[in-house]
Every structure is written in C-alpha cells, then in structure tokens.
Amino acid sequence: MNRIHAVILDWAGTTVDFGSFAPTQIFVEAFRQAFDVEITLAEARVPMGLGKWQHIEALGKLPAVDARWQAKFGRSMSAADIDAIYAAFMPLQIAKVVDFSSPIAGVIDTIAALRAEGIKIGSCSGYPRAVMERLVPAAAEHGYRPDHWVATDDLAAGGRPGPWMALQNVIALGIDAVAHCVKVDDAAPGISEGLNAGMWTVGLAVSGNEFGATWDAYQTMSKEDVAVRREHAASKLYAAGAHYVVDSLADLPGVIAHINARLAQGERP
C-alpha cells in the first residue's frame, strides 16, 4: 500500500533528552578532563548528530576551538588527541546517559498512535553501542521501546551523514520501499542521513539540539524567545533539506497524514 510504513527516529533531542543535553555537557567535560581545554555548550552543539569520534574531530576544526588548541599546544588537534578525548568521553557518557533517558513529552502517545496505524518504529543514534546498551533499557523502563535500533559504530560503512543506519532499519523492519519511510531528527546530519537514504525527512525545531533549552527553561520562556529560537532551529533544519519542520515528535502524525496524501498522488521524497 502506498503510504508510510515506518519511521526512523533519532534518540537524544528527538525521543528522549529534551534539548539534547546528555552529549553536549559530556563533550565539555571530556575536553576539560583530557587536555584542560575549555569549549562552550554552544560549540559542543555545532556538529551534533555525527558519531561521537567524528563529533570531536569536527569540534577541533571549529576556528575558535582550533585557536585555543593552537595557543595551548602550538599545533592543531591530531587523531591521537581525538582518541584521548574520546577515551575520556566514553565512560562519562555511559555513566550519565541513563539520567537523560526519559521520553520527551508526547513521545509515548505518539508512538502508540503510529503503531495503531500499522507504522513500525525504527531508530538510530550518533551514540556508540556501548552507550546505547545503557540508554535503550533505561528508556524502556520509562515506556519507550522502538522496534529496532542501530548505533553509530554498528556498521562497517559508518554513520551519519551517510544513509547506512537508516537503511539498516529498513532491512531489519522489512520495509518494502524507502519512499515509505520517514526519518525524524533534531540535527542536520540526521536530516542528511534521511535524504541520502531516499526517505522523507522531518526536522524537530523545539525539542532538540538546535533549540538547545531544557524542558523547564522552555516552559518558562517568553513567546518571543521561543519564536526566535524556533526560527533559528527551523532555518538550519530546512537548510539541511528537511521536507518538513515541526516542534516535536508529538506533531508527527499530522505530517505523516500529509505525506500519505502526497504518496497517493504519486509524489516521492
């Protein structure tokens, strides 16, 4: 049948961890712990969505971070430096990720509604398997259990922005066509992943990395501040090629209804 059969969901900032704070805070701490180099939360957010080793590599290439590194060490960051920061990052992230495993508001009800429509729930993450093996059961205790998940280091081909994790979900879930899948993510590399996999893509402008606020801060934010942050996030997600941008996963059923109508007219992603 010519309709959406599966959604492939990101984790932090999409289904759990409103604002995607678990990884950002740990990047700051890992740089500090490994080399006594300071980076800001805003800098830590810039490459979000990549695998974590690649994320650290991208952070080292940010002009401001590279300038600090050069001032301290007289050279740019090396692969060995990235390895050292990653080695500091991993135990910190494994220890902390369960503290950020609660589903974002609306996720549980949305998943139930999608399943009632016969839609399968795939997922993938920029987290490596060692982190996911802690996060997945912790999220399950809170009621979020996707049908499948893939970690960024699971596949020999690699992770985002390549299509491989999304396509592995297609295989595992037995979906007949990538055009019948929606990739949902709060960061640009995840949107690119979906596009590279030939899927419809939906960006989340409020719940995730680009908006970058805690749930409590969001609840007390003025309408003006919300609008400014939403526009900033949405512009980045649309620039990455997202077919749709909405606030959070709770808005997804309406988007899928719209996509189903387009599929019925013969449209493709």
Swiss-Prot record:
Pfam families: Hydrolase. The active site is at 10 (nucleophile), 52 (schiff-base intermediate with substrate). Its cofactor is Mg(2+). Its EC number is 3.11.1.1. Coiled coil: none annotated. Keywords: Hydrolase, Magnesium, Metal-binding, Schiff base. Binds 1 Mg(2+) ion per subunit. It catalyses: phosphonoacetaldehyde + H2O = acetaldehyde + phosphate + H(+). CDD domains: HAD_PHN (cd02586). One of its GO terms (cellular component) is cytosol. The keyword Cytoplasm does not apply. It comes from the Bacteria. Mg(2+) binds at residues 10, 12, 186. InterPro entries: HAD-like_hydrolase_sf, HAD-like_sf, HAD-SF_hydro_IA, HAD_sf, PGP-like_dom2, Phosphonoacetald_hydro. One of its GO terms (molecular function) is phosphoglycolate phosphatase activity. Homodimer. Involved in phosphonate degradation. Belongs to the HAD-like hydrolase superfamily. PhnX family. This is Phosphonoacetaldehyde hydrolase. The gene is phnX.
